[in-house]
């Protein structure tokens, strides 16, 4: 792995690894995708994008707006796309490297429209507002296992007033010193986002390109469509040097085949079409191979995100991205629960663990509830603990002369214990040590107030919002960013 000054993330190159496919199976998915990209192809709604495809050798039908992308163009684009790029934070200690086969990172969920708030032991659900974005950004700035910040909810209090998405760009950058990933950008406003980023760098566009503190996500429309907005986010992002995340939200049984392998083919075609557009626009553009693909529950009429299928799909996507040499960004830490309860804990663990073991470069979903509609700050704090435990599981059991401990076993002998050994004292932090998960006996727990996990998490949220200090932005620079 290349050396970097980035410290965030967790190394997935050693320890436990999950492999879902043989190389032949990955090739089969690839070749099936190449067939789909030629027949039926992808509908591209944006005239500028169609022209870019046409000028680079793709077959374009202006009447149907269908673009057919030959395999040689896909292969060329994949050769141009970097396998590694750095996401900068305002504080460089939060820089993260997105690298195929590299570290696993976590970010919060986005983008919901409601907040689940804990009040006097009960939960209330309210519309999300701009202040919620600021508070969650501060909480993520504190959370050691959240490596960068994604737009978690919409600022619905400024909806309809114009420039809602610009508010949703400025507020996070000010309230966290970690990198900001905009999950709901508007193509026609990308230049406004760029003005904010450039202002942070004193108007130095070259520095802003070299050290991107901001990135964007767009979603193809399943099945097999690139909207005008998606195309414009890709094109403008590529031209400005902004990292772009092409993320499919296919639904198995709804907008993609009911078989998960078939869903991966649809998903793959959608993501690759966006990545090809980025590379044809500006060769070498920084891109993620993204996924929020899941199943469609034919009985409930919903798209569950706490299901084992979502975990499997996200793990599969991580392997597809590795097959193509691209960094991956996948859904995980997800739940269909309405409040931070046992259902949430179970679902979040399985949907976090599977893609983590597959080596996904970023797993997003922390703090999310209710199939992605709702965000909970208490749940984010709990998820921070869950992630730390998943990291411990990822380590596996290292076997070496030191860890086999033959000398220690012989020294202690029969019937004694290892507590007094220097090795034991030195490795006091070796076992997992979650912040909130309670491992005391019942009597000690009861004596401290008998608080359940959500209550303890709420206390931590209150403490962080009151006391955590985010690295400030110089007043003159802040004024320019607001201009």
Swiss-Prot record:
It comes from the Archaea. One of its GO terms (molecular function) is trimethylamine methyltransferase activity. Pfam families: MTTB. Pathway: One-carbon metabolism; methanogenesis from trimethylamine. GO terms for biological process: methanogenesis; methylation. It catalyses: Co(I)-[trimethylamine-specific corrinoid protein] + trimethylamine + H(+) = methyl-Co(III)-[trimethylamine-specific corrinoid protein] + dimethylamine. InterPro entries: MttB-like_sf, MttB_Methanosar, MTTB_MeTrfase. Its EC number is 2.1.1.250. Gene3D superfamilies: Trimethylamine methyltransferase-like (3.20.20.480). Keywords: Methanogenesis, Methyltransferase, Pyrrolysine, Transferase. Can form a complex with MttC. Belongs to the trimethylamine methyltransferase family. NCBIfam families: trimeth_pyl. Catalyzes the transfer of a methyl group from trimethylamine to the corrinoid cofactor of MttC. This is Trimethylamine methyltransferase MttB. The gene is mttB.
């Amino acid at each position: 792995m290349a050396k970097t000054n980035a410290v965030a993330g967790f190394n997935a190159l050693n320890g436990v690894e999950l492999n879902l496919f043989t190389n032949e199976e990955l090739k089969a998915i690839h070749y099936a995708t190449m067939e789909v990209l030629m027949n039926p192809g992808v509908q591209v709604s944006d005239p500028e994008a169609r022209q870019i495809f046409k000028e680079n050798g793709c077959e374009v039908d202006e009447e149907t707006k269908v673009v057919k992308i030959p395999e040689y163009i896909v292969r060329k684009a994949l050769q141009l796309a970097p396998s590694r790029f750095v996401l900068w934070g305002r504080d460089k200690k939060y820089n993260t490297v997105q690298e195929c086969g590299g570290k696993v990172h976590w970010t919060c969920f986005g983008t919901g429209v409601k907040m689940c708030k804990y009040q006097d032991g009960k939960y209330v659900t309210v519309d999300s507002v701009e202040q919620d974005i600021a508070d969650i950004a501060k909480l993520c700035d504190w959370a050691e296992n959240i490596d960068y910040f994604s737009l978690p909810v919409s600022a619905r209090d400024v909806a309809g007033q114009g420039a809602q998405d610009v508010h949703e760009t400025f507020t996070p950058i000010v309230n966290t010193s970690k990198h900001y990933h905009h999950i709901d950008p508007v193509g026609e406003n990308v230049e406004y986002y760029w003005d904010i980023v450039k202002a942070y760098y004193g108007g130095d566009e070259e520095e802003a390109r070299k050290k991107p503190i901001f990135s964007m996500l767009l979603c193809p429309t399943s099945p097999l469509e690139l909207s005008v907005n998606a195309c414009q986010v890709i094109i403008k992002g590529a031209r400005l040097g902004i990292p772009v995340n092409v993320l499919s939200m296919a639904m198995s049984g709804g907008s993609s085949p009911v078989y998960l392998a078939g869903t991966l083919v649809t998903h793959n075609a959608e993501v690759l079409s966006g990545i090809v557009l980025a590379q044809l626009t500006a060769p070498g553009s920084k891109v993620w191979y993204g996924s929020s693909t899941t199943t469609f529950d034919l009985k409930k009429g919903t798209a569950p995100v706490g299901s084992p299928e979502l975990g499997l799909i996200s793990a599969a996507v991580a392997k597809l991205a590795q097959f193509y040499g691209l960094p991956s960004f996948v859904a995980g830490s997800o739940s269909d629960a309405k409040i931070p309860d046992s259902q949430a804990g179970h679902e979040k663990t399985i949907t976090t663990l599977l893609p983590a073991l597959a080596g996904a470069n970023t797993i997003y979903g922390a703090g999310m509830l209710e199939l992605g509609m709702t965000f909970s700050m208490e749940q984010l704090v709990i998820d921070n603990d869950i992630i730390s435990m998943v990291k411990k599981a990822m380590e596996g059991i290292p076997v070496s002369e030191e860890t086999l401990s033959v000398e220690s076993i012989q020294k202690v002998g029969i019937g004694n214990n290892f507590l007094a050994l220097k090795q034991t004292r030195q490795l006091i932090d070796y076992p997992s040590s979650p912040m909130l998960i309670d491992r005391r006996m019942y009597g000690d727990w009861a004596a401290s107030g008998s608080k359940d996990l959500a209550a303890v998490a709420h206390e931590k949220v209150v403490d962080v919002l009151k006391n955590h200090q985010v690295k400030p932005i110089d007043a003159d620079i802040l004024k320019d960013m607001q201009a």
